[in-house]
Amino acid sequence: MIGHLRGIIVEKQPPYLLLEVAGVGYEITAPLSTFYHLPEPQEEILLYTHLIVREDAHTLYGFHNDHERRLFRALIKVNGVGPKLALAILSGIGPDEFVHCVLNQNIDQLVRIPGVGRKTAERLVIETKDRLSRWHTNDTPSPEGLRSSNTQPTQDAISALMALGYKPQEAKRAIDAIQKPDLSAETLIRLALKQMVLGT
């Protein structure tokens, strides 16, 4: 099991990034909550990792801190929640907001995440509440001050939202509603998700 990787970011395009470690490039899938903390390409970063091995693929997931990774591991243990949905949850609502929803049994907010129906939301609360009540974190992602290395932040943001399960029309409508094309892709995604999932 690979516990963490320290290396240089070669490229990043949510939800994927390429990390070079000792001359080897690792393709890593990460939630948007992690992307909010990433430096620019060619800078060094430490990512906590979780490797999932299947017959057709070995997928390496990366996280900004151990709290995010523990939450991801708790999510994939829930009946009906696989890695893709777990990633969508962390991307769509953020680790701290998810914990808040679970502890307060806010089913209505959870079902606004793409791929999460009412039954899944109820299982998330039932199966993770006790564990999450024992966890505490002060790590709150913030998109402020982050820059995108891509020259097409709007298109990148729309593509990232589609990768999370939103329809093309929904993604474009959410990005267009922000009306700030000069923002980075990460910030556009964050604001769009806040609008679609949290309703603010």
Curated annotation (Swiss-Prot):
InterPro entries: DNA_helicase_Holl-junc_RuvA_I, Hlx-hairpin-Hlx_DNA-bd_motif, NA-bd_OB-fold, RuvA, RuvA_2-like, RuvA_C, RuvA_C_sf. Gene3D superfamilies: 5' to 3' exonuclease, C-terminal subdomain (1.10.150.20), DNA helicase RuvA subunit, C-terminal domain (1.10.8.10), Nucleic acid-binding proteins (2.40.50.140). Its main location: cytoplasm. GO terms for molecular function: ATP binding; four-way junction DNA binding; four-way junction helicase activity. Keywords: Cytoplasm, DNA damage, DNA recombination, DNA repair, DNA-binding. One of its GO terms (biological process) is DNA repair. Residues 149-200 are annotated as: Domain III. It is found in: Cytoplasm. SUPFAM superfamilies: DNA helicase RuvA subunit, C-terminal domain (SSF46929), Nucleic acid-binding proteins (SSF50249), RuvA domain 2-like (SSF47781). The keyword Hydrolase does not apply. CDD domains: UBA_RuvA_C (cd14332). Residues 144-148 are annotated as: Flexible linker. Residues 65-143 are annotated as: Domain II. It comes from the Bacteria. The keyword NAD does not apply. Disulfide bonds: none annotated. GO terms for cellular component: cytoplasm; Holliday junction helicase complex; Holliday junction resolvase complex. Homotetramer. Forms an RuvA(8)-RuvB(12)-Holliday junction (HJ) complex. HJ DNA is sandwiched between 2 RuvA tetramers; dsDNA enters through RuvA and exits via RuvB. An RuvB hexamer assembles on each DNA strand where it exits the tetramer. Each RuvB hexamer is contacted by two RuvA subunits (via domain III) on 2 adjacent RuvB subunits; this complex drives branch migration. In the full resolvosome a probable DNA-RuvA(4)-RuvB(12)-RuvC(2) complex forms which resolves the HJ. The RuvA-RuvB-RuvC complex processes Holliday junction (HJ) DNA during genetic recombination and DNA repair, while the RuvA-RuvB complex plays an important role in the rescue of blocked DNA replication forks via replication fork reversal (RFR). RuvA specifically binds to HJ cruciform DNA, conferring on it an open structure. The RuvB hexamer acts as an ATP-dependent pump, pulling dsDNA into and through the RuvAB complex. HJ branch migration allows RuvC to scan DNA until it finds its consensus sequence, where it cleaves and resolves the cruciform DNA. Has three domains with a flexible linker between the domains II and III and assumes an 'L' shape. Domain III is highly mobile and contacts RuvB. Belongs to the RuvA family. This is Holliday junction branch migration complex subunit RuvA. It comes from Coxiella burnetii (strain CbuG_Q212) (Coxiella burnetii (strain Q212)). The gene is ruvA.
